[in-house]
């Protein structure tokens, strides 16, 4: 997102050429876009219109055989204009457990965020809050290392995500976890997998 999706055809070709070296290990590629603050651009904060204008030609460049997911961090952008753009191309909107984004129940109460067969979810968390918590616990000697164990219990939230997503999934589902979500990404991933398996099909 550093180039703002402008004049990125050559860098995109180079990037994809490198990624293809991963072969069968390469999964869907995530295009992550930053939050736009209201104070920076009130209209863009509310609508994402400029972002969509730049996103459409970028998606036209993207090879159909290479799976892509698109992540935004403005909740107001999860609306028909963006959803329809992604749906036309069969590209999943990445669903995010992030402090600027809606909880799963609220997310699915609005326009249907499913834009493809693939469900793609990211457990991101709040970087500033988690950094502060981990630093505080480390100073107290409550952690052997900064990111070696869970710092908070996110099981109730993940259980809600699992229930909503499993009932809404149209095909395969992929979940990715960040250390900043609960303090240790591998344990968060294991926890979500276990919770997912307990949700009735």
Language model features with spans:
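Residues lining hydrophobic/aromatic ligand-binding pockets adjacent to catalytic sites
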Residues: 1-201
């Amino acid at each position: 997102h550093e180039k703002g999706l402008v004049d990125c055809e050559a860098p995109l070709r180079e990037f994809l050429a490198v990624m293809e070296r991963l072969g069968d290990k390469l999964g869907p590629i995530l295009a992550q876009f930053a939050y736009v603050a209201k104070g920076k651009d009130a209209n863009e904060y509310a609508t994402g219109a400029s972002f969509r204008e730049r996103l459409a030609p970028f998606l036209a460049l993207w090879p159909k055989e290479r799976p892509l997911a698109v992540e935004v961090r403005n909740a107001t952008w999860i609306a028909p204009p963006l959803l329809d753009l992604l749906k036309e191309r069969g590209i999943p909107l990445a669903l995010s457990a992030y402090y600027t984004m809606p909880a799963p129940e609220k997310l699915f109460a609005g326009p249907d965020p499913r834009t493809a067969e693939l469900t793609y979810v990211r457990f991101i968390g709040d970087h500033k809050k988690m950094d502060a918590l981990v630093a505080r616990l480390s100073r107290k000697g409550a952690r052997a290392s900064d990111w070696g164990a869970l710092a908070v219990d996110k099981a109730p939230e993940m259980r809600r995500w699992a229930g909503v997503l499993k009932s809404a999934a149209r095909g395969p589902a992929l979940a990715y976890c960040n250390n900043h979500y609960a303090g240790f990404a591998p344990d968060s991933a294991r926890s979500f997998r276990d919770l997912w398996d307990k949700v009735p099909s």
